Every structure is written in structure tokens, then in C-alpha cells.
């Protein structure tokens, strides 16, 4: 049978999602816990491979197993064998046609900026700290040029392995909640470091270092070297993955929990 899981994790203690031989990873910890509960080796497929230090409240994974367990047994059993910074939010048996990555029609990320003169003591691994007066409204205006299917070469990592630089951005919103600035962006898929590279350039506009038209200029240039530095990983969350209605996957609050939805 095929099982889908919704998971959340604090990525600050891991070298990213993907299993690696020499370092700790979210995938490695989940596969270990699932293999204990299933009493057989389990291999996982995920909706989006997050980088080192990046978090998730809405990651979706799937695996195949011969083990017969009810949803409660999977959830409680796996959580009991996971570190405290990874948790299963829901479990659902799915059709064999479901694939966590290839069935997904959209991914959504939130980047949380703590905009204050002094660094945070609490949530220091859950937000990215930037001082200076950030104009969230300008960032939002500038970001609207990113909508639609476009060539995002200027915002892809040098090591990106995607065969095409084209992605379709469905929505992008920048809002302020007190000391926090939140960049919320959804697309059919993302290039390596695409969200953090977009945020890095939007911050230059929000801080007044670049004009509102700069994002459009960068898109036209198709040159990563012309854009701003990659934003820090700590404030980034994979908050949602969209699938066709036929799979009837649970929908929970997006998070992160310390932000208002």
C-alpha cells in the first residue's frame, strides 16, 4: 500500500531534507523512524527538498509498505521514534497513482523576517534577522512583476540542476505584522534557492537600495550575478503543497505557528 504523510520540522539542526551518508538529514531521521514502525526498510519521496537550515510546516511525503497499520498507529509510532524537531501532522492511505513530488501542482513558501535593530533571543533559528527600516509595501509592489510563467535564471543557484529556468509564480505577497515582514510565494515549482534569491533582491528594494523596477530588470537580464545575495535560510518555511482534489489530502493551518494565518 502507499501512504502519504504531512510533516513539519525545524531544519536548523539538519543538513537539509535529503539523506546523506555523513551528516544528519530530515529524510534520514524519518526513514529510520518509519522503518522501525513498519518493521521493514522504508524509502521516502518528498514534495520539495529543503536546504540546510530551512523549515517546513507543510511538507508532504509518501512511501510504499507491506505493513498494515491504522493512521493513528503510524502517527503515534513514528512520532515516538522521531527527534523532537520533526513531527508527523497527518497520515493518509493514498492511491498508487499518487506521488508526493510529481502529483503536486503547486508549492507555497513563507519567509519570515525579524525586522528590528537588535537580534532575537527567542526564535533565532526560526526567523531571519535584518535591521534597518524595511518597507514591506515597496517589496510587495516590486514583487508583482514575478507573476506568471517566466525565465527565473537571475534567481536560480549556480548549482541548480533543473533542465529549464522557467517557473510559473501563482502569487506573491509581502506583508508586515509588527516587527515581522512575511514574504508569501506560491508557484508550480521552484528552482534551487529561488525563494531565498528573490527575497534577497526584494530586501534591497525594501531597504531603499534599489528602485521598484529592479526586479523586472533582473528578470530581463537573466544573470544571477546581477541579483542580490541569497537570503539566509533560517526564515524560510515550506508551508503548503497543492494536489488534485481526487487525493483528498488533509488541509491544516499553514503556519509557522507563531505567525497569524
Curated annotation (Swiss-Prot):
UniProt keyword tRNA processing present: yes
Binding site for substrate: 109
Active site: 51
Key words of the record: Isomerase, tRNA processing
Domain of life according to the entry: Bacteria
InterPro entries referenced in this protein's UniProt entry, alphabetically: PsdUridine_synth_cat_dom_sf, PsdUridine_synth_TruA, PsdUridine_synth_TruA_a/b_dom, PsdUridine_synth_TruA_C, TruA/RsuA/RluB/E/F_N
Name of the protein described by the UniProt record: tRNA pseudouridine synthase A
Lineage: Bacteria, Pseudomonadati, Pseudomonadota, Gammaproteobacteria, Alteromonadales
Gene from which the chain derives: truA
Amino acid at each position: 500500500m502507499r501512504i502519504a504523510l504531512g510533516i513539519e520540522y525545524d531544519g536548523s539542526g539538519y543538513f537539509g531534507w535529503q539523506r546523506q551518508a555523513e551528516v544528519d538529514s530530515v529524510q534520514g531521521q524519518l526513514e529510520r523512524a518509519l522503518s522501525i514502525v513498519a518493521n521493514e526498510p522504508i524509502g521516502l519521496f518528498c514534495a520539495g527538498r529543503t536546504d540546510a537550515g530551512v523549515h517546513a510546516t507543510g511538507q508532504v511525503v509518501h512511501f510504499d509498505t507491506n505493513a498494515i497499520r491504522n493512521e493513528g498507529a503510524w502517527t503515534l509510532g513514528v512520532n515516538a521514534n522521531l527527534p523532537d524537531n520533526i513531527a508527523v501532522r497527518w497520515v493518509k492511505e493514498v492511491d498508487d497513482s499518487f506521488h508526493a513530488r510529481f502529483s503536486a501542482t503547486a508549492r507555497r513558501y513563507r519567509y519570515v523576517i525579524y525586522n528590528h535593530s537588535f537580534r532575537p533571543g527567542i526564535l533565532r533559528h526560526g526567523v531571519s534577522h535584518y535591521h534597518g527600516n524595511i518597507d514591506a509595501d515597496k517589496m510587495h509592489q516590486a514583487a508583482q512583476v514575478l507573476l506568471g510563467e517566466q525565465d527565473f535564471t537571475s534567481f536560480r543557484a549556480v548549482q541548480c540542476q533543473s533542465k529549464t529556468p522557467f517557473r510559473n509564480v501563482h502569487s506573491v505577497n509581502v506583508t508586515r505584522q509588527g516587527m515581522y515582514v512575511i514574504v508569501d510565494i506560491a508557484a508550480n515549482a521552484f528552482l534551487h534557492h529561488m525563494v531565498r534569491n528573490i527575497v534577497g533582491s526584494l530586501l534591497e528594494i525594501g531597504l531603499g537600495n534599489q528602485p521598484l523596477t529592479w526586479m523586472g530588470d533582473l528578470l530581463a537580464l537573466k544573470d544571477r550575478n546581477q541579483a542580490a545575495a541569497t537570503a539566509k535560510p533560517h526564515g524560510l518555511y515550506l508551508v503548503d503543497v497543492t494536489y488534485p482534489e481526487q487525493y483528498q489530502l488533509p488541509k491544516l493551518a499553514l503556519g509557522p505557528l507563531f505567525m497569524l494565518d
